[in-house]
From Swiss-Prot:
Assigned EC number: 1.1.1.330
Lineage: Eukaryota, Fungi, Dikarya, Ascomycota, Pezizomycotina
Natural source organism: Chaetomium globosum (strain ATCC 6205 / CBS 148.51 / DSM 1962 / NBRC 6347 / NRRL 1970)
Descriptive protein name: Very-long-chain 3-oxoacyl-CoA reductase
Family assignment from sequence similarity: Belongs to the short-chain dehydrogenases/reductases (SDR) family.
Subcellular location: Endoplasmic reticulum membrane
Pathway named in the protein's UniProt entry: Lipid metabolism; fatty acid biosynthesis
Entry keyword Lipid biosynthesis: yes
GO biological process: fatty acid elongation; sphingolipid biosynthetic process; very long-chain fatty acid biosynthetic process
Membrane-spanning intervals of the chain: 25-45
Entry keywords, A to Z: Endoplasmic reticulum, Fatty acid biosynthesis, Fatty acid metabolism, Lipid biosynthesis, Lipid metabolism, Membrane, NADP, Oxidoreductase, Transmembrane, Transmembrane helix
Residues involved in NADP(+) binding: 70, 125, 133, 152, 219, 223, 252, 254
Job description of the protein: Component of the microsomal membrane bound fatty acid elongation system, which produces the 26-carbon very long-chain fatty acids (VLCFA) from palmitate. Catalyzes the reduction of the 3-ketoacyl-CoA intermediate that is formed in each cycle of fatty acid elongation. VLCFAs serve as precursors for ceramide and sphingolipids.
PANTHER family noted in UniProt: HYDROXYSTEROID DEHYDROGENASE-LIKE PROTEIN 1 (PTHR43086:SF2), VERY-LONG-CHAIN 3-OXOOACYL-COA REDUCTASE (PTHR43086)
Lipid biosynthesis in keyword set: yes
Length: 342
């Protein structure tokens, strides 16, 4: 069957249809069309402003000098840097991590550096999911004027691994630490923030929580869980004056990432945490509410993906799979070389 298309006839019919719409309807449709076309432009402008022009919420909103901040996973990496920079801003610290000796060393260092700083420490292994540990945390912070909670504790896979080959202990630890540990800590600390009618909860997210990541499937799922949990919690605690924000990051030079060199796309912990604490509340161009990507190149990279192929598209998943297969291959070869040296 042959179809004959008359372009002029199609155009005339389209114009007739348009003219049959009441003028108010025409204006409404034109406005919707303009918004659709303008949305990427407005999103890019918001991205630029957030990255380079605007400052986030002043942390003094959450308490005067001497207010306490709780930091989990505090002895290394981003957690250690959050503790250091919060101390520099005048917050006393409750430091929670697995190794008491590391906590003691960090606490002494910060107290010597910042005159008048007070610290409290709690060694707990989040992978054990021990209710007694959370009871000790509740007892430790009882009576403290806490203004900030940083949910930084987390674990990823040792190397990219197919889900069917993931060790059961590793799978269990990732879910227990990233999900249960974050939730239970927040249940202990958040009532204090809500009672004082002001507070901030920062929870570390990840690109892997926004973009499905093969060969890191369990970690990716745990961070996606935190994304939705954090957005939901933000709505619940807003009437109580508590701001809840998910902090999205790509790669940072930490022990978890196993990356040592910085680059345009990979900041060090000091750079990343500085941006995280200075950009609180700048969430205008994000897919999810109450979420922000503080490091400028991470934010730009994420915006490009979301504005083109899409964060959850087949193309993005394929690229993530290829990248992590390559990382796994290199890691296994390195392990083989080291084994031969022994």
């Amino acid at each position: 069957m042959a179809f004959n298309f008359d372009a002029q006839e199609i155009l005339d019919r389209a114009l007739d249809l348009w003219n049959s719409i009441p003028q108010a309807g025409q204006w409404a449709l034109a406005g919707l069309g303009a918004l659709y076309v303008a949305q990427p432009v407005l999103s890019f402008i918001q991205l630029f402003l957030n990255c380079f022009i605007l400052s986030g919420t002043n942390l003094r909103k959450y308490g005067k000098k001497g207010t306490w901040a709780v930091v989990t996973g505090a002895s290394d990496g981003l957690g250690k840097e959050f503790a250091s920079q919060l101390a520099a801003k005048g917050f006393n610290l409750v430091l929670v991590s697995r190794t008491q000796s590391k906590l003691d060393t960090l606490a002494r260092h910060l107290e010597l550096r910042w005159s008048g700083l007070q610290t409290k420490t709690l060694a707990m292994d989040y992978s054990q999911d021990n209710d007694a540990d959370y009871e000790r945390l509740a007892e430790l912070i009882s009576g403290l004027d806490i203004g900030i909670l940083v949910n930084n504790v987390g674990r990823s896979h040792s190397i990219p691994v197919p889900f069917l080959e993931t060790a059961r202990e590793e799978l269990q630890d990732i879910i227990t630490i990233n999900c249960l540990g974050t939730l239970k800590t927040t249940q202990v600390v958040a009532p204090i923030l809500a009672k004082r009618k002001k507070g901030l909860i920062l929870t570390m997210g990840s690109f892997a929580g926004v973009m499905p990541t093969p060969y890191l499937a369990t970690y990716s799922g745990s961070k996606a869980f935190l994304q939705h949990w954090s957005s939901s919690l933000a709505s619940e605690l807003k009437p109580h004056g508590v701001d809840v924000q998910l902090v999205v990051s790509y790669l940072v030079t930490t022990a978890m990432s196993k990356i040592r060199r910085t680059s345009l796309l990979i900041p060090n912990p000091k750079q990343f945490v500085s941006s995280a604490l200075s950009k609180v509340g700048l969430t205008g161009n994000e897919m999810f509410p109450n979420t922000y990507t503080p490091w400028w190149s991470h934010a730009a990279f994420k915006w490009v993906i979301e504005s083109t192929v899409g964060a959850t598209s087949g193309v993005t998943i394929w690229f993530n799979r290829k990248m992590h297969v390559d990382i796994r291959t290199r890691a296994l070869r390195k392990a083989e070389r080291e084994a031969k040296k022994q």
